[in-house]
UniProtKB/Swiss-Prot annotation:
This is Iron-sulfur cluster assembly scaffold protein IscU. One of its GO terms (biological process) is iron-sulfur cluster assembly. A scaffold on which IscS assembles Fe-S clusters. Subsequently gives the nascent cluster to other proteins. It is likely that Fe-S cluster coordination is flexible as the role of this complex is to build and then hand off Fe-S clusters. The gene is nifU. It comes from the Bacteria. InterPro entries: ISCU, NIF_FeS_clus_asmbl_NifU_N. GO terms for molecular function: iron ion binding; iron-sulfur cluster binding. Pfam families: NifU_N. Forms a heterotetramer with IscS; each subunit of the IscS dimer contacts an IscU monomer. Belongs to the NifU family. SUPFAM superfamilies: SufE/NifU (SSF82649). One of its GO terms (cellular component) is cytoplasm.
Length: 126
């Protein structure tokens, strides 16, 4: 199985690695995992008063495809509304990174992490 150049780039030079303070009201955190392979993904968003994701970061324990998926989506969601970010599908991620079929679960984790972070943000700001 060969990784695409985009996967290798995001794995070797991951963007937006880090974390925000979870107590901040404008921060939403999503923690998801895939027990089958041991991948764990934490994705956080920082949302401005207009409902736009102004920043995003991640910490992922997992394979190169999981790290690349996390890195890619943090780039994609910056500047998007919550609704736009929620509409990102794992198929978009898998296609952009040219993930092999055996690694599709990594793109599913990234989609789930986005949704979990948005849900957390919404729950904190009801």
């Amino acid at each position: 199985m060969a990784y695409s150049k985009k996967v290798i780039d995001h794995y070797e030079n991951p963007r937006n690695v880090g974390s925000f303070k979870t107590i901040d009201a404008n921060v939403g955190s999503g923690l998801v995992g895939a027990p089958a392979c041991g991948d764990v993904m934490k994705l956080q968003i920082k949302v401005n008063k207009n409902g736009i994701i102004q920043d995003a970061c991640f910490k992922t324990y997992g394979c190169g495809s999981a790290i690349a998926s996390s890195s890619l989506v943090t780039e994609w969601i910056k500047g998007k509304s919550l609704i736009e970010a929620e509409n990102i599908k794992n198929t978009n991620i898998a296609e952009e990174l040219d993930l092999p079929p055996v690694k599709i679960h990594c793109s599913i984790l990234a989609e789930d992490a986005i949704k979990a972070a948005i849900t957390d943000y919404k729950n904190k700001n009801k």
